[in-house]
Amino acid sequence: MLTIADVEFESRLFTGTGKFSNSQVMLEAITASKSQLVTVAMKRIDFKMGLDDLLTPLRQAGVRLLPNTSGARNAKEAVFAAELAREMLGTHWIKLEIHPDPKYLMPDAIETLEAARILCEKGFIVLPYVHADPVLCRRLEEVGCAAVMPLASPIGSNQGLVTESFLKIIIEQARVPVVIDAGIGAPSQAARAMELGADAVLVNTAIASSASPIVMAECFKEAVQCGRRAFEAGLGRVQTGAVHTSPLTGFLNQ
């Protein structure tokens, strides 16, 4: 069981709502994934129309919504988006995203740390999306973040665990849950993230852009479960040389 702040999750696969062909496919894929935490960009919600077809089906499915501040270019904009989410959606959970560069969508470490400090002081449950920077993740813990969400590779790139060496350090040092976010493009990569000891992964593009999103969601669900079980079982130590599995006392007693 995974616990973030005061909430327990049976599923360690978090999902998103973007890039699906329509809301019905999105809902069916999320249902198939068994995800219990789904992120949604505040900029995609039309509050003038009330709770539209993006939010209503998700709430009916019983998943927890995690609004994000995607599109914010600085701490001020991110704090505004978070406060709007709390007022309109009735949640103090927020995925903090600040990426001023529209081409590569790299998170701004300085603005993210400042926004995290402000939001934690305001009583938010903050899950910041950041570079795989062990020092930054520790600083975010210190200001009160409930979890950290280091990237595996650029958002939507499907490149996999490009930052694996740094993710290992973050996982080793973290005192809050580590959710690997962005760039996971295949179930095998999600399984690998879990084998490293990550507490959860967030996957969106790899599911939504699949030719069969519902089947792919099921594949990710199973991969995350297997990866976590492998981590808990204890993976064998990696050796630089060969290690024999049978006695080296001669051949057939000769």
From Swiss-Prot:
Pfam families membership: ThiG
The UniProt entry, under InterPro entries, shows:
Aldolase_TIM (IPR013785), Thiazole_synthase_ThiG (IPR033983), ThiG (IPR008867)
Record key words, sorted: Cytoplasm, Schiff base, Thiamine biosynthesis, Transferase
Q: Which domain of life is it from?
A: Bacteria
Q: What class of enzyme is it?
A: transferase
Residues of the active site: K95 (schiff-base intermediate with dxp)
Q: Which GO terms describe its cellular component?
A: cytoplasm
Q: Which GO terms describe its biological process?
A: thiamine diphosphate biosynthetic process
- Please give the Gene Ontology molecular function terms for this protein: thiazole synthase activity
- Pathway(s) it belongs to: Cofactor biosynthesis; thiamine diphosphate biosynthesis
Q: What is its EC number?
A: 2.8.1.10
Please write the reaction equations for the catalytic activity of this protein: [ThiS sulfur-carrier protein]-C-terminal-Gly-aminoethanethioate + 2-iminoacetate + 1-deoxy-D-xylulose 5-phosphate = [ThiS sulfur-carrier protein]-C-terminal Gly-Gly + 2-[(2R,5Z)-2-carboxy-4-methylthiazol-5(2H)-ylidene]ethyl phosphate + 2 H2O + H(+)
Residues the record lists as binding 1-deoxy-D-xylulose 5-phosphate: G156, A182, G183, N204, T205
**Localization of this protein:** Cytoplasm
Q: Which PANTHER family does the protein's record reference?
A: THIAZOLE SYNTHASE
By sequence similarity, the record places it as follows: Belongs to the ThiG family.
Q: Could you describe the subunit structure of this protein?
A: Homotetramer. Forms heterodimers with either ThiH or ThiS.
What does the record give as the function of this protein?
Answer: Catalyzes the rearrangement of 1-deoxy-D-xylulose 5-phosphate (DXP) to produce the thiazole phosphate moiety of thiamine. Sulfur is provided by the thiocarboxylate moiety of the carrier protein ThiS. In vitro, sulfur can be provided by H(2)S.
Name the UniProt record assigns to this protein: Thiazole synthase
Organism, by scientific name, is Shewanella baltica (strain OS185)
Gene that encodes the chain: thiG
